[in-house]
């Protein structure tokens, strides 16, 4: 409901040389005597890069491997990890957009949330009146910047009586480059109301 308070818990599930797995639990904020209502869970993978060279950094070399003290592999997160989104040859170009100032983050890259908004905008409001977004996966492949043109390819990969699943690929053209480069792959699973 509007104005309900909620809490996001987060923890590092695992760490590898260049990546960490971080889990999330979203639940209602309650008094200490009440059981918190769980609204959902999330999983993410993060990479550490040198902000000047844009190259990966060995996480275990930072502060003598301090990250190991923050790993909690015992805390449950009952959703499946993301899988690699596989696009078939049937993906159709459904939209092309230009990118502007409001699409970028402080580093000058297209903001992660903007990619998600643009993907969700591929489905009209009437679709959302009859379908609930049950699962959303996104993988960032390359960076894009203000002025790049983004192309959205959509493919329905599964349809059952109560479920529809779509794979989405986003490519870019730079200002002076006609070649398309893949920047994002995503999967959206909807449940019919």
Predicted regions and their residues:
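HotDog/MaoC-like acyl-thioester-processing domains
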Residues: 1-80, 140-149, 155-193
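Hot-dog-fold acyl-thioester-processing enzymes
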Residues: 47-132, 193
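Phosphate-/nucleic-acid-contacting segments
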Residues: 135
């Amino acid at each position: 409901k509007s104005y309900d308070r909620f809490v996001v818990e987060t923890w590092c599930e695992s760490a590898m040389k260049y990546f960490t797995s971080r889990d999330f639990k979203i639940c209602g904020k309650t008094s200490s005597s009440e059981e918190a209502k769980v609204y959902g869970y999330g999983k993410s993978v993060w990479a550490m890069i040198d902000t000047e060279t844009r190259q990966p950094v060995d996480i275990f070399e930072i502060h003598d491997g301090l990250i190991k003290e923050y790993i909690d592999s015992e805390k449950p997160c009952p959703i499946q990890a993301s899988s690699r989104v596989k696009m078939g040859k049937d993906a159709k170009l459904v939209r092309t957009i230009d990118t502007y100032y409001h699409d970028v983050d402080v580093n000058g890259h297209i903001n992660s949330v903007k990619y998600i908004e643009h993907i969700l905008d591929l489905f009209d409001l009437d679709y959302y009146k009859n379908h609930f977004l049950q699962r959303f996966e996104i993988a960032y492949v390359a960076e894009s910047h203000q002025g790049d043109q983004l192309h959205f390819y959509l493919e329905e990969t599964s349809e059952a009586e109560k479920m529809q699943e779509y794979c989405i690929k986003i490519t870019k053209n730079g200002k002076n480059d006609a070649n398309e480069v893949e920047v994002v792959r995503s999967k959206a699973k909807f449940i019919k109301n």
